Amino acid sequence: MFKKIISFLTAIFISILGINALNNEMELLDGDFGYILDEAAQTAIIKTIYIPNNEKKDLVVPKYVSFHGNNHLVIGILENAIRSKVHRIKSFMAREDFINSARNFHSLTWLIIFNIPIISVSPAT
């Protein structure tokens, strides 16, 4: 019971981080990348992001959502995923150095809590 309460509170905390991230304008950067594989929810995961010239861009990608961006954008994407039926998310794929970075740990915590596999991919050379 205690473990479920901790898991629930952690999920709420991460959701708040994600909402804050999506409310701020974010610069898209090359480097970090990943996929949230979700055939059922499809485009429900991500709604709108901001690109550097203040133009809003809706991301519509059938069957999966891919992203390139900084840590805040990743948190926002994960927050949207947790709000759109977590049980449908099959796995999360990201670059090895992204997953191993201490600064990204809090954005991956809820994946661990919900036993969603995190797949590590070596960076392209």
Q: How would you name each of these model-derived features?
A:
Residues F2-F98, H106, W110-T125:
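N-terminal capping/linker segments that flank leucine-rich repeat
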